[in-house]
């Protein structure tokens, strides 16, 4: 019998039945095959312009480096996904190890078969890029023109045999040739047929074109007939491939990686075809997405190394009673503890208890956007977009609602049930502007509507009243305003794409170094660390002035409070005079009745001559603890005088 923490969590709360299964949403398997063109133009290095930021590697090297870096990321962060590299236009041909000379797919070289990337695959690709280890003369362009239908048919076979049941299969084509079959209509027609076969198979073709200064990539010549647009794709989103330019200030590698990363993770809906009721009799269908989700390191697992090949240990869970007898599932009942007793339910009763109506998103009213406080969020927001699959015209109605909410600066209040047995949630429907709209302040988020979960009355906790902090002087505020204005982020906005999680990246780098037998990095690259030199250069003088002003204000405030305490103590002194002690009558040092006397006694060192009773009376009047022996009382009183007088 083995035990897993997540098993106990499911047994305790059964939350998996009540919430959308986000783990399934995140871990759908994906298969990506890179198809990289090997031609003379792809092998040609860019001209040396003397610019340090200009490209130095050929387009082919940049494409292979991009595939290498993506493979490095996936080998750890997405261990269930498959990836492969196919070179086309090569002089040599190779399909698989057992397929002879690859005559079935001429000028196609399967460099890395579509599979879960292993350390050896990454090392092989790294040697080809960094060391220039091309002993097999793989990167030699063919003398004959490439036949694109052969490459597409080869990719078809790779996906069919290696990733037949994958939910997402994609072919990434990297090339600088916009018309591989110029003047050959038969070859173009054959390639279009093969592309249609891939589309029918469920494979999405993504093109990453490379243009040069003297030649712009023209999609209409060939690739418009190869790349199939998804008819059910979200309206309003451009699906045109982004062109990477070689030879300009922005390196080709960075451009390729940016374009590929934008399509690296396929769009997976969090829920699909959810009825969205805007009014009685007016319903459209929507899809939900989770654009923002906190990434955590992959879970560790137990590995058995007793055999030739290490194997992941398969865990099993069993329920036992007090006598260590295994309890069958039919003997178990689910229940809740109530009033010291366990209230048990049958499965059908429990299902009925969870039934809160059909899945829906129903608007119940509207409010000004300013009426929704920033703290009223209990979960992460869900991005919704229209779907035409169930209700034709959903896009137009959805767009009208979005534009109206933006125009009037309002939000919708809605009742949200994600699925049949899910808990209902009250949500605010927030509109987001276009990414290129500066007033929207969301250049990295899509335009549309967001479901912003709101708390119920049961979710609001009572908090003890906290007094507001004292208001600082206006001079301090004005001086600090200059500091803040000079330390603002670009465009006064936080862009999460520029700040990778340092702990997550460090975790992956260590695993990568172990897997690839590389040197362990000395320190992690943390871009969240403050740039102290730049901060000092910008606001060092302002901060020094502010600190001097703060010290002056604090000193003035301390003197004012000390004078006020002394004035109040003198006013509150009783009219009846206490009988002087013998020591006072004889001219000895009596107790200090005022702050001035107390300070004088401290300077003369006569506090220790007071009795314990006198010390306690003075300390009690000052709010100082009177516990301890005489030496402790004297020391505590001297410290108070030194700090306050």
From Swiss-Prot:
Residues 607-641 form the SAP domain. It holds the Pfam family Ku_C. InterPro entries: Ku70 (IPR006165), Ku70/Ku80_beta-barrel_dom (IPR006164), Ku70_bridge/pillars_dom_sf (IPR027388), KU70_core_dom (IPR047087), Ku_C (IPR005160), Ku_N (IPR005161), SAP_dom (IPR003034), SAP_dom_sf (IPR036361). Residues 276-486 form the Ku domain. Residues 1-10 have a biased composition (Basic and acidic residues). Keywords: ATP-binding, Chromosome, DNA damage, DNA recombination, DNA repair, DNA-binding, Helicase, Hydrolase, Nucleotide-binding, Nucleus, RNA-binding, Telomere. Residues 1-26, 565-601 are annotated as: Disordered. GO terms for biological process: DNA recombination; double-strand break repair via nonhomologous end joining; stalled replication fork localization to nuclear periphery; telomere maintenance. GO terms for molecular function: ATP binding; ATP hydrolysis activity; damaged DNA binding; DNA helicase activity; RNA binding; telomeric DNA binding. One of its GO terms (cellular component) is pericentric heterochromatin. Residues 11-22 have a biased composition (Acidic residues). It is an enzyme of class 3 (hydrolase). It catalyses: ATP + H2O = ADP + phosphate + H(+). It is found in: Nucleus; Chromosome, Telomere. It comes from the Eukaryota. Its EC number is 3.6.4.12. CDD domains: KU70, vWA_ku. Heterodimer of mus-51/ku70 and mus-52/ku80. Single-stranded DNA-dependent ATP-dependent helicase. Involved in non-homologous end joining (NHEJ) DNA double strand break repair. DNA-binding is sequence-independent but has a high affinity to nicks in double-stranded DNA and to the ends of duplex DNA. Binds to naturally occurring chromosomal ends, and therefore provides chromosomal end protection. Required also for telomere recombination to repair telomeric ends in the absence of telomerase. ku70, of the ku70/ku80 heterodimer, binds to the stem loop of tlc1, the RNA component of telomerase. Involved in telomere maintenance. Belongs to the ku70 family. This is ATP-dependent DNA helicase II subunit 1.
């Amino acid at each position: 019998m083995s035990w897993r923490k997540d098993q106990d969590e499911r047994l305790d709360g059964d939350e998996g039945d009540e919430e959308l299964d986000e783990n399934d949403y995140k871990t759908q398997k994906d298969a990506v095959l890179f198809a990289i063109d090997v031609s003379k133009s792809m092998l040609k290095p860019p001209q040396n312009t003397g610019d340090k930021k200009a490209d130095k590697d050929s387009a082919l090297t940049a494409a292979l480096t991009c595939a290498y870096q993506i493979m490095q990321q996936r080998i750890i962060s997405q261990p269930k996904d498959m990836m492969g590299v196919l070179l086309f236009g090569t002089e040599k041909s190779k399909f698989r190890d057992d397929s002879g000379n690859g005559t079935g797919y001429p000028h196609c070289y399967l460099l890395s078969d579509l599979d879960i990337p292993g350390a050896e695959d990454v090392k092989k690709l790294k040697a080809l890029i960094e060391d220039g280890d091309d002993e097999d003369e793989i990167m030699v362009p063919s003398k004959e023109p490439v036949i694109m239908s052969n490459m597409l048919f080869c990719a078809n076979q790779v996906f069919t045999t290696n990733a037949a049941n994958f939910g997402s299969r994609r072919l990434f084509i990297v090339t600088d040739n916009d018309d591989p079959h110029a003047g050959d209509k038969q070859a173009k027609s054959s390639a279009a047929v093969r592309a249609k076969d891939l589309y029918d198979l469920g494979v999405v073709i993504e093109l990453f074109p490379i243009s040069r200064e003297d030649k712009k990539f023209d999609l209409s010549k060939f690739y418009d007939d190869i790349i199939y647009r998804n008819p059910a794709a979200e309206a309003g989103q451009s699906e045109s491939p982004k062109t990477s330019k070689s030879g300009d200030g922005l390196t080709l590698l960075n451009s390729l990686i940016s374009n590929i990363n934008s399509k690296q993770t396929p769009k997976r809906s969090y829920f699909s075809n959810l009825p969205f009721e805007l009014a009685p009799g007016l319903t459209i269908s929507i899809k939900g997405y989770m654009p923002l989700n906190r990434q955590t390191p992959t879970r560790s697992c137990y590995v058995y190394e007793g055999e030739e090949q290490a194997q992941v240990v398969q865990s099993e869970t069993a329920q036992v009673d007090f006598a260590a007898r295994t309890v069958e599932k039919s003997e178990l009942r689910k229940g809740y503890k109530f009033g010291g007793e366990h209230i048990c339910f049958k499965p059908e009763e429990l299902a009925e208890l969870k039934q809160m109506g059909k899945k829906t998103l129903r608007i119940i009213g509207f409010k000004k956007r300013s009426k929704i406080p920033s703290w009223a969020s209990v979960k992460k927001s869900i991005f919704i977009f229209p779907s035409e699959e169930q209700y034709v015209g959903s896009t137009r109605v959805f767009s009208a609602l979005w534009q109206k909410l933006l125009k009037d600066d309002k939000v919708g209040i809605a009742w949200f049930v994600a699925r049949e047995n899910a808990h209902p949630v009250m949500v605010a429907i927030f509109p987001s502007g276009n990414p290129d709209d500066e007033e929207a302040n969301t250049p990295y988020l899509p335009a549309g509507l967001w479901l912003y979960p709101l708390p119920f009355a049961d979710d609001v906790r009572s908090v003890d009243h906290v007094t507001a902090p004292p208001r600082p002087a206006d001079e301090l505020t004005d001086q600090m305003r200059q500091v803040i204005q000079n330390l603002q982020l670009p465009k006064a906005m936080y862009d999460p794409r520029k700040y990778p999680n340092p702990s997550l990246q460090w975790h992956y780098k260590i695993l990568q170094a172990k897997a690839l037998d590389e040197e362990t990095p000395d320190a992690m690259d943390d871009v969240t660390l403050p740039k102290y030199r730049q901060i000092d250069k910008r606001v060092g003088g302002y901060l020094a002035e502010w600190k001097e002003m703060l010290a002056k204000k604090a000193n003035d405030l301390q003197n004012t409070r000390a004078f006020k305490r002394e004035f109040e103590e003198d006013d509150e002194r009783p009219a009846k005079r206490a009988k002087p002690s013998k020591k006072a009558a004889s001219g000895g040092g009596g107790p200090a009745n005022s702050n001035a006397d107390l300070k004088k006694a401290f300077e003369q060192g006569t506090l220790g001559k007071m009795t314990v009773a006198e010390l306690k009376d003075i300390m009690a009047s000052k709010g100082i603890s009177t516990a301890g022996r005489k030496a402790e009382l004297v020391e505590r009183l001297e410290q108070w005088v030194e700090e306050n007088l």
